[in-house]
């Protein structure tokens, strides 16, 4: 099994999403850590989307014209991000919710994945995802409560976006959720215990 592990939290050891993503990887990888590719998207800080930063497989990338050495290095990094995702059997992503949505570093990584003819295609019936055999697990941490039945549902643009974008590629992501982390120590402790239990219930 090839496992791709990504983190997008700006926090270090205090990050709940980083803790949960690491727990998931340990459960899945077991005694085969060499099968894991790890990317810290905050440390790598992929640049935002332009025609020059698109992977070479994207048809729009040709509009960038000839690239200098620095531009080619960015293009090569984009190609690597796409190829790592395509090659992975399982992808584990630590996702904090910032300002109602995902971190911009994670969005920049996702922008490298949506390549027509590689991860999806357009057919007579509309778009078709090409990554349906891939497993994606999201370790999502939220300070407030945004689940069904709460008043904040319309403000939730992290989980909803990720389900939409991976669904577009043919993937139904699994979710390990810790929410209400900023609603007092009691709520935080309950959320962490529930999320850790959910990790233990994941199919290895």
Swiss-Prot record:
Reactions the enzyme catalyzes: 2 a quinone + NADH + H(+) = 2 a 1,4-benzosemiquinone + NAD(+); N,N-dimethyl-1,4-phenylenediamine + anthranilate + 2 NAD(+) = 2-(4-dimethylaminophenyl)diazenylbenzoate + 2 NADH + 2 H(+)
Cofactor(s) listed in the protein's UniProt record: FMN
InterPro entries in alphabetical order: Flavodoxin_fold, Flavoprotein-like_sf, FMN-dep_NADH:Q_OxRdtase_AzoR1, NADH:quinone_OxRdtase_FMN_depd
Coiled-coil residues: none
Cofactor note: Binds 1 FMN per subunit.
GO molecular function terms noted in the UniProt entry: electron transfer activity; FMN binding; oxidoreductase activity, acting on NAD(P)H as acceptor; oxidoreductase activity, acting on NAD(P)H, quinone or similar compound as acceptor
SUPFAM superfamilies: Flavoproteins
Binding site for FMN: 9, 15-17, 97-100
Signal peptide: none
EC top class, as a word: oxidoreductase
Sequence similarity: Belongs to the azoreductase type 1 family.
Subunit structure: Homodimer.
Xref: HAMAP family: Azoreductase_type1 (MF_01216)
Classification via PANTHER family: FMN-DEPENDENT NADH-AZOREDUCTASE 1 (PTHR43741), FMN-DEPENDENT NADH:QUINONE OXIDOREDUCTASE (PTHR43741:SF4)
Function noted in UniProt: Quinone reductase that provides resistance to thiol-specific stress caused by electrophilic quinones.
Name of the protein in its database record: FMN-dependent NADH:quinone oxidoreductase
Protein species of origin: Methylobacterium radiotolerans (strain ATCC 27329 / DSM 1819 / JCM 2831 / NBRC 15690 / NCIMB 10815 / 0-1)
